[in-house]
Structure formats: structure tokens, C-alpha cells
Amino acid sequence: MAVSCQLGDSGESVNRKRRSSPRRGRLIKALFFDVDGVLTDGRIYIAGDGTEFKVFDTKDGHGTRKAIAAGLKVAWISGRTSPATSARAKDLGVHACIQGQHEKRAPYERLCRRWRLYPSETAAIGDDEPDLPMLEAAGFSACPADATPAARKAAQVVLKRAGGRGAAREFIEMVLALNGKERIVKRKP
């Protein structure tokens, strides 16, 4: 069963599935992101010489900096290895950027141990089947509006925005609100 809630200044609603939350009142301390399909729109541009290009949303980048400034650890775990992903992660100050990991449970668990976090203290966002272990393990999970059916089923929240089009920012704002770092605002009719 889905319920609707409103978060943020936009007053936009999100579809939240009822599922008992493993958070047990803990604050979220770390954010785990898939890259392709979450931080990008999932498309990869390849020039004639083989150079790869990706497009990252600047609003998502600002949200990432905001999360880091609020004291959250930020990790990107990607199935692909890309210099563009490395450069963007470095530019934003992402704490961990792990690439070439098609199986994401092991790096997720490794970072939880390194950062001394319970899974209930983490939030994860992903858009496809390789992301399911993170979505299922995290205390809070979400997926972009254009995620695959499997990711939509596994996530606690299906966001309004698509991957590479503000989904990461929407997710970050939601986590900050859950942590009490942002006030929840409802738009007046």
C-alpha cells in the first residue's frame, strides 16, 4: 500500500510504500548512491575516439555538498569504471567512490564497517537490479521515478524526479528532513 507525503519547499508529494522501517529511531549518517541511472540519466556518450562522457545535474551536486556539510558520509558505488565519475566525485568531496562493482553488497558492508555504522544508519538510492542489496539493507531507501520495476519494489520510496534530473537532490533533501536538518514544509492550497 502506498501513502503520500510532502517534503521540501516544492510541496511535491512522493509515493511512500508502507514497510516497517529498520531505522528504529536512528539518524541517517551515511548516503549510498548508485551512479548511472541515479546521478546520471543512465545514458553514456562515447565519442569516436572512445572518450566517454556523462552528464551530472548541478542541483544534485549542490545537494551532495549540502549533505556533506550536514555531516553525512557520502559513498558512490558504481558497476562501471569511469574517469568522469571519479572527477565528479572528487570535485564534490565524496568520501568514497567505488567503481567496477557489479555486486554492491560487499562494498556497502565494507564501508559500513569502516565508518562504524549500522545499516539502519544508512540511506541508499539505486535504479536497477545490481542496487537491490543496498536498497534492501539500508535503513532508508529510495529510487528515481524512472527506476526498473525491481528497484521500485525494493525501495521504500519512489521519488518524483528521474535519475540525472534531480532524483539525488530530492533523496538528499528527504534524508535531511528525516534527520531533522531540514524542516518539512507543506504548500498551502
PLM regions with names:
Residues 3-7, 15-106, 189:
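Alpha-helical substrate-recognition element adjacent to the catalytic core
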